[in-house]
Amino acid sequence: MVRFKHRYLLCEVVSDDPRCRLTLEDRVLGTLVRDTIARVHGTFGAAACSIGFAVRYLNAYTGIVLLRCRKEFYRLVWSALPFITSLENKGHRYPCFLNTLHVGGTIRTCQKFLIQYNRRQLLILLQNCTDEGEREAIQKSVTKSCLLEEESAGEELSDSGGEETAEPME
């Protein structure tokens, strides 16, 4: 049996209007990307990318989107994303664009990148904050994310099947 290889595009919906993110739906976003691929690459691009294309993850609050497509045609999807200029949902049109953050072979690599990306964003916010209350809240978030990462790393080591460090032979 042959495994189908996919690529995952981790994108961020960037918009000045905060209502744009709150009205996001995976069905609408998937249709928008498919229509844009058809407009940019024609019927060949639409047919090639429709096989295996899916919106795997969508967070309406942060605007993070994870798109899955076949490995052979991920460049077609990737090259069509800059042509998305607005999101139309429920009769409203919101100007926005998709910023591609990472292209990965697994969902896990995209998750690891997203954790690092969010940590960098928190550190940038920490440098730019003016109020002491904001500064404490951001420092608390950074500390919490570091503690969660250490716990998950500890769990991965304990799940390695009992192959901890061996004692050196003398």
UniProtKB/Swiss-Prot annotation:
Its primary localisation, in coarse terms, equals: nucleus
Q: Where in the cell is it found?
A: Nucleus, Nucleolus
**Gene Ontology terms, cellular component aspect?**
multimeric ribonuclease P complex; nucleolus; ribonuclease MRP complex
Pfam families membership: RNase_P_Rpp14
- The keyword Nucleus appears for this protein: yes
A Gene Ontology molecular function term of the record: ribonuclease P activity
Keywords assigned by UniProt, alphabetized: Nucleus, Phosphoprotein, rRNA processing, tRNA processing
Q: Spell out the residue ranges making up region: Disordered.
A: 149-170
Its domain of life reads Eukaryota
Q: What does this protein do?
A: Component of ribonuclease P, a protein complex that generates mature tRNA molecules by cleaving their 5'-ends. Also a component of the MRP ribonuclease complex, which cleaves pre-rRNA sequences.
Supply the PANTHER family for this chain.
Answer: POP5 HOMOLOG, RIBONUCLEASE P_MRP SUBUNIT (PTHR48414:SF1)
Task: List other remarks.
Answer: The last C-terminal 19 amino acids are not required for complex association and RNase activity.
Q: How does it assemble?
A: Component of nuclear RNase P and RNase MRP ribonucleoproteins. RNase P consists of a catalytic RNA moiety and 10 different protein chains; POP1, POP4, POP5, POP7, RPP14, RPP21, RPP25, RPP30, RPP38 and RPP40. Within the RNase P complex, POP1, POP7 and RPP25 form the 'finger' subcomplex, POP5, RPP14, RPP40 and homodimeric RPP30 form the 'palm' subcomplex, and RPP21, POP4 and RPP38 form the 'wrist' subcomplex. All subunits of the RNase P complex interact with the catalytic RNA. Several subunits of RNase P are also part of the RNase MRP complex.
Of which family is this protein a member? Answer: Belongs to the eukaryotic/archaeal RNase P protein component 2 family.
Q: What is this protein called?
A: Ribonuclease P/MRP protein subunit POP5
Q: Which organism is it from?
A: Bos taurus (Bovine)
- Source organism phylogeny: Eukaryota, Metazoa, Chordata, Craniata, Vertebrata
Q: What gene is it encoded by?
A: POP5
